[in-house]
Amino acid sequence: MVGGMSTWLARRVFAAAAACAIFAACAPRAATFATRSSGMGIDPFGHTRMSEPRASVPPDEMAHTQRLLALLRNDLVQYRDPAAAERDGFLKQGDDVPVGALKHFFKYENFAKNRTHLDPKAPAAILYRRTANGFELAGVMFTAPISAPMDELDRRIPLALGHWHSHRNICMPPKGAPMTTHAQRAPFGFEGTITTRAACDAANGVFLDNVYGWMTHVYPYAPTLADAF
């Protein structure tokens, strides 16, 4: 079981989440590491909720954020090669992604650690950007409980900088359902037309009121502080 889901469902959810996070635009890159993605994209059916932005970062939180970025820059060097991340339990899920898009390598056990606090050494996922020659280290993803208030999210990653988001009211297709045509896929997943439990039940799907709580990406090798989140 992963986060209360069967392993099969968890893997399918992760694959769908990763597919939802593919965006074509690419920001400028540092010399050795990729940087951030282009944003959350369009969500016509309201499955994505964003955190409430704040106007500024208090000095103590800014110091905390700078320490976090420094720790991540130092620790993530060991995962420049995705094979090293996989050896440490970060698993690549879903299909390949196009050049320029992000790929998530998830570590299931770290989701439990993220429930209580943000540990720089226990990200829920490591992010790689697809290149013509493979994958380039980009950053990490952290999570927090869906019940976490804005003040708690702000303590972990300041809301004036970070973009916490949550995926809600998702209907996953039933196991074994054919998903080869657009009509078969359209009702389900993170961009699906189904948004209620009743409609999901009618389609014999698996309804998730949220998927792994709040999430945020951090790009510690970005050229500016604003680009790091």
Regions found by a protein language model. Give the residues of each.
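Sec-dependent N-terminal signal peptides
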Residues: 15-20
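Primary mode marks residue(s) on the alpha4-beta5-alpha5 output face of response regulator receiver
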Residues: 33-126, 130-229
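Bacterial N-terminal signal peptides that target proteins for export
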Residues: 2-14
